[in-house]
Swiss-Prot record:
Bacitracin is thought to be involved in the inhibition of peptidoglycan synthesis by sequestering undecaprenyl diphosphate, thereby reducing the pool of lipid carrier available. It is a multi-pass membrane protein. Belongs to the UppP family. It holds the Pfam family BacA. It comes from Streptomyces avermitilis (strain ATCC 31267 / DSM 46492 / JCM 5070 / NBRC 14893 / NCIMB 12804 / NRRL 8165 / MA-4680). GO terms for biological process: cell wall organization; peptidoglycan biosynthetic process; regulation of cell shape; response to antibiotic. This is Undecaprenyl-diphosphatase 2. GO terms for cellular component: plasma membrane. InterPro entries: UppP.
Amino acid sequence: MSWFESLILGLVQGLTEFLPVSSSAHLRLTAAFAGWEDPGAAFTAITQIGTEAAVLIYFRKDIARIISAWFRSLVNKEMRHDHDAQMGWLVIVGSIPIGVLGVTLKDQIEGPFRDLRITATMLIVMGVILGIADRLAARDETGGKHRAAKERKKLQDLNIRDGLVFGACQAMALIPGVSRSGATISGGLLIGYTRESAARYSFLLAIPAVLASGVFELKDAAASGHVAWGPTVFATVIAFVSGYAVIAWFMKFISNKSFMPFVWYRIALGIAIIALVATGALSPHAAESAG
């Protein structure tokens, strides 16, 4: 991998990780259109350490409170009813599905799931689901001619069942094209949460899974000796900087804007990929590395 490739791929990772458009799909597509080798699941996992570092810094006050309360709840029974302590447990519970499936489906994630036809299908299907979820949220928030506005759930209302729903949605993002934030936010909206609450828990929920995946891939990459460490680290730093900027923008955006622009973008991109593959302009396995 060249330094230019790492710059572009790092930017793509940072700019798309927190938007409901699938960063893994965009990394895969960028490489395919540029004629580069598929950066692979390992590169994606390692550079995601950079974007999760951005989450740690942006939500540092929330995370510090949650960690402190969670540890205190281990020795103080009264603390177990504290919202921040419960949030710590709910992040752990919500991380179980992706942990189990990530290990079980590792070979599929690094192989068959990276077919561009699957990526395109997931972009469209999950785009439609996000659109439905967004419409339901908007209807509850504004009401209608014959119905009053409905109060939506906030993070204080999160429970184990809902945490597992979020977690199951996050696990779906192991397939390129799904989008971690898109799937979890869609799931949260469908079970009644506000846009901001769904997004906030989505970002917090990703921390354990992404960091664990990144460390796991780092270990394997170091053992294989086939990683261009300089460009990979550079891409991770670029992903961190651009990712932080996107989080700050996105949290403001969702406070009063619809997700529909992302929905139409996903659908249009998915259709374009299918058309390019169908006409032979793009191979479904384009840019895959020999390994």
